[in-house]
Amino acid sequence: MTPYNRTSQVEIMAPVGSYESLAAAIKAGANSVYFGIEHLNMRARSAANFTTDDLHKIVAICREAGVKTYLTVNTVIYPEDIEMMQTIVNHAKQAGVDAIIASDIAVMQYAVQQDVEVHLSTQLNIANTEALKFYAQFADVVVLARELNLTQVASIYKDIQEQDIRGRHGEPIRIEMFCHGALCMAVRGKCYLSLHNLNSSANRGACAQICRRAYVVKDKSSDIELEVDNEYIMSPKDLKTIHFLDQMLDAGVRVLKIEGRARGPEYVSTVVRCYREAVEMWEESRKSKVESRKTEMEQKIAEWDKQLATVFNRGFWNGYYLGQRLGEWTNDYGSKATKKKVYAGKCTNYFKNIGVAEFLLEAIPELHEGDDLLVTGHTTGAYECTAREMRTDKPVTVVKQGELFAIQTTEPLHRGDKLYLLESIG
């Protein structure tokens, strides 16, 4: 389905919250996808989740593409959740899901009983080798604690090799780390701010994101408000590691996890593609240690940085991987993406023999030749192109609202796909 090497030793794991994002992840070169169903996952409220009825279809789509499927069941599990948890794990087994991502021992034990592979969530806060050795009896992959630096990660990786720490299925346990996306003010998501203020528990997948709002510091006795340098004092910037990805991989990280199940397919497509290219360059550089490749990598990093800035982000920082102990906070609400998408219309037909898509412009006044476009759909994923050689009943440079028009595309599109205009910001 794609030209990407899915047999790479480094796994790119993409977030999926919709069929559009699923298609985007596959086409961009993801090795695996992770997603939630029902309410026992850490994005139960903020992301569009699938249902148990979707499992067989998701697994079938991914198997055809050679992509692994991981189901998140990583919230705190209360007594009244046990039956639902068991039902979800049973459905996952029947559908052929490759692994369950878990943080509660009840989920791990039941998954093991059902012979379903387990991956350890970062919610477990595993930060040392001894803890990892204990949990290895249940799992094959571990997401280490987010606040670890790469020296500490490398030390744990060395212990895995030297002490021959193996997972439940007998293979050396693999280290997974987040490489890109949103970070929590509570570092690993163990936050009670939303629960305390709105009775909506982040640890149950219902974070209300009130840390992302602007706040003032007020003296209760005098009502004096203090001005602070940054009113978004609890909203961290997003993680980006592509400029030191080689250090992560050299430290022993073998699964790169992208955050963003609540994001659109264009986010998934762009981020997966950039990190896939970076991993392939790292693998090539290990084979041929040529100095020119260092310059080439530096040039590519600048390109990737520019591309990653076009999709949702709150500004970027390195996380804690390089030894920084204090977080970096955003100074704005919402996204700092350099492009925004504006709904423009829909695909009304696709002519496979000539590679031409027909669209109805229904939501913006005009579309001009040279405009950047985004098309999304359940099968299409996220396809970007530029409006060139547009035709109505004749060649045109401007299309008016309500008109049908056609353009050549390099990928097949589908009737019902959504058309967006991509506008530059700033």
Question: How should each PLM-predicted stretch be described?
Answer:
Residues 90, 109-114, 132-134:
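Hydrophobic, small-residue-rich alpha-helical packing segments that form membrane-like cores
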Residues 1-28, 32-44, 56-59, 65-75, ...:
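Surface-exposed amphipathic alpha-helical tracts and adjacent flexible/coil segments at the periphery
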Residues 21, 106-107:
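Alpha-helix capping/helix-boundary segments
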Residues 48-54, 83-88:
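Charged helix-capping and loop-helix junction motifs
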